[in-house]
Amino acid sequence: MAKTYDPNNVFARILRGEIPCKKVLETEHALAFHDINPQAPTHILVIPKGAYVDMDDFSARATEAEIAGLFRAVGEVARGAGAAEPGYRILSNCGEDANQEVPHLHIHVFAGRRLGPMITKG
């Protein structure tokens, strides 16, 4: 089932230039910018320029060029932030149970300190 994309979500508005961002990288298929509420010393969001709700939507509908472009941008952002060594974490929440807050696919790049366990047991 196709997911409904909200063209007025905050990331769509950033892509259209309606809301400013602290840009890190822009490519043909991706935009990366600093998170406004960082959870680590380095916390950068990487988003596709296309209208995709989440990773499920993106993996089903994106072109090969968009997929490669997004993931290459994630790597370029991590390297540019000096995070390739000693390491970094990437995370993308998909859907309500994962607590996805913005209905536009976004990949978090966290770095700059030891990050600890991925999730808490519950």
From Swiss-Prot:
Transmembrane segments: none annotated. Residues 10-120 form the HIT domain. It holds the Pfam family HIT. A motif (Histidine triad motif) lies at residues 104-108. InterPro entries: Histidine_triad_CS (IPR019808), Histidine_triad_HIT (IPR001310), HIT-like (IPR011146), HIT-like_sf (IPR036265). GO terms for molecular function: catalytic activity. This is Uncharacterized 13.2 kDa HIT-like protein in hisE 3'region. The lineage of its organism: Bacteria, Pseudomonadati, Pseudomonadota, Alphaproteobacteria, Rhodospirillales.
